[in-house]
Amino acid sequence: MKRAGTLRLLSDLSNFTGAARLRELLAGDPAILVRCSPDGRHLLLLRPPGSPAPQLLVAVRGPGLPLERAWSEGDPSPLDVFFVPWLARPALILVWESGLTEVWGVGMEPGWKLLQSTELCPDGGARVMAVAATRGRLVWCEERQPGVEDQPGQLSMAFNHCVCVKTLDTSGEAGTKLGCTHILLHHCPSFGLIASRKELFLVPTSTTWPGVAHVLLIWSPSKGKVIVAAPSLGLSHSKSLNPKQGDTWDFRTLLRGLPGFLSPREPLAVHTWAPSSQGLLLLDLKGKVSLVQCHGGTRTVGLLQEAPVGLQGSAALGTFHGTLACVLGSTLELLDMSSGRLLERKVLSTDRVHLLEPPAPGVKNEEDLETRGALRLLSALGLFCVCWEAPQGLEVPSDKDLVFEEACGYYQRRSLRGTQLTPEELRHNSMFRAPQALASILQGHLPPSALLTTLRAELRDYRSIEQLKAQLVAGDDEETGWTELAEHEVARLLRTHLTGDQLAQFNTIFQALPTAAWSATLQALQLQPDRSGRLRSQAPPDVWKKVLRAPTAGKEHPNGILPPFELLCQCLGQLEPQWLPPFVELAQQQGGPGWGAEGPSLPLYRRALSVLGEEGKRPEALELELLLGSGRPKAVLQAVRQLIKKEQWERALEAGLTLDSSSPLLRSEIFNLLLAEFAQHRRLDTHLPLLCRLCPPEVAPDELLLLLRTHLPDDAGATPFPEPGAEPGAEPPLTVGLVRALLEQTGAQGRSSGPVQSTFEDILWDSGTPPPTPPRGPMTTLQASDHPGQEAWGPSGQGLGAADVGVHS
């Protein structure tokens, strides 16, 4: 069913003070300036110069006194009047072309009173061309008289303006006070000023020099920068502009440093400018509506059915709920901002229609609860709102029904059952507590005291976050505020499933504020170093399960979005690379079976290496630490080979010695690698004691000699000294003296285990007692047989019998 845009009457203006005067002024001159206070209770009307009294009217809805001001023909009327934003009490600022500024406010006593009167241009000879108020600042563009250093001429007159800013102090019992002045831009053309809630737009006017009339500026006080944009050229450039740091710019110097901005181009043919929450709306003379975004980019929103008739016709632009509303004369057109499609076109009964800005966020307004976010129209007939209304016959589900329907889809995505979950099953099944608790809260059966006790912690966190947001909006200590907000958001995301949009937001925070994001992760995982330099964690397994969840096998990271573990490793590698290997080792201890994606997943050390760069371009020291700490045989052997290649012998030996008895094969493989190096050159001789400790206990001396023989170079000489014709600096060959320590190690291990296991054992060990000396005397038959002749070798049986007889005789 198609939704319908409706005009709903909010007030016939009878509840405003001075309703008759208010209707009279609204039905009169269409060029009247209309503004609304941030709380929506005050309406301000300023008539153009030369109009009959009163020229200024401030009407109040409900109790209160109106404000009427009139100026004689000799006294000019104010150039502009507006409410001070972000104030609990209403306050007005009146600015004249001469620079005279008055601040009016409502105190404890009824009625309006003058709080302050000051001059924006104390030197004289200057006049204010445009003025705006944004986020505690008063900004104006003033035309100055040419100085002595300025060359006379038309070009000098075109750039004799400057843009100034004055702080608005809204604290204390005295109300609003104007502070010190700072110049933002020197030698600039005439600019119009349009303020939104966050940015200030400096737009060209009909008197702007044609050569720069295609350029506009966007100043963001909270970010301390100005963006120079040329919508017709598609160019934008950012520069620092922070009054707190004393930043100021010469407009001509600023443009000369930006290539392409001074290209010949027609001035912007704009009929109407209007601020919005997304940027600045502009309507050209052909009926095309464009949006200049806060970063300087421009996009077309849509094309109106009819174009404005000249520059004199009245037009107003506004947005609500993704819809663009344009009042052109007595016609109201509604367009979809995403597609530009015309949604609805209405013909109004009057062409004296004014669009009002929506109330400030967080302001309580009982009449706007049902129409919150809707666009408001003001005419002599009353105050209306433009909103979308559901067609008749469409049944809107209750809040409790929406809770169970949303929970049904949530549980269905995570259910392992084949049957479809239904809202009725969630209502009556006691296993699903969360939707039932939320539905009970919405139903309101819990007493306020019990509900407050249940939600006290959540409300405290919510209040602190809202206070932090208000601090950021005010622009106070933004660096600390953004850091704290990032910590809150990371802690919240770690309580979710970290998939889809949550994972994308997790990546965005780490890219924008890596230090704050890692600090929040440190607290969530409860990471603490121990005395041995390792990391410990007291976080529950559910948190580690979310962090270590691997991506789906065979799929690349979409749009550069990294899984949580890869993102943490990347951040830690940039901030504190020395803690990355201990973090990966801790993650390997915390990881459990089935925590990866479907199918086999990569080991954690390889996932950490993947974010450090391609192979060959990674930091070598960090890669070695990750390989050695992985505990994987292939990774450890790869690290040992790299250490051998770099001739870091002691570290390679320590890598093998640190392995416990549960890895005998890996330790033996490392010993074989180092033994091969020991056999080929003499650069490992100084570390021979460590090599002996690394020798496996099951290696026998003959096996050791066979291994050494296998790895001996083919051109090794037979002597322990270089040949006479050998090249200088040649490696001496391996000698028995060097091998003796290894043979003694294997011999000692073999001797302590029992009987002799090798034929070389008697070479290394003697009994310490010589054999007994044979007796001296006549030689017996047995003794004669010790020196047998050829005739003495007879059959074995006969010889054995003769010897036996001789012994016992």
UniProtKB/Swiss-Prot annotation:
Residues 747-809 are annotated as: Disordered. The keyword Kinase does not apply. GO terms for cellular component: BLOC-2 complex; cytosol; early endosome membrane; endoplasmic reticulum; lysosomal membrane. InterPro entries: BLOC-2_complex_Hps6_subunit, HPS6_C, HPS6_N. GO terms for biological process: blood coagulation; lipid homeostasis; lipid metabolic process; lysosome localization; pigmentation; protein localization to membrane; protein secretion. Keywords: Cytoplasm, Endoplasmic reticulum, Endosome, Lysosome, Membrane, Microsome. May regulate the synthesis and function of lysosomes and of highly specialized organelles, such as melanosomes and platelet dense granules. Acts as a cargo adapter for the dynein-dynactin motor complex to mediate the transport of lysosomes from the cell periphery to the perinuclear region. Facilitates retrograde lysosomal trafficking by linking the motor complex to lysosomes, and perinuclear positioning of lysosomes is crucial for the delivery of endocytic cargos to lysosomes, for lysosome maturation and functioning. This is BLOC-2 complex member HPS6.
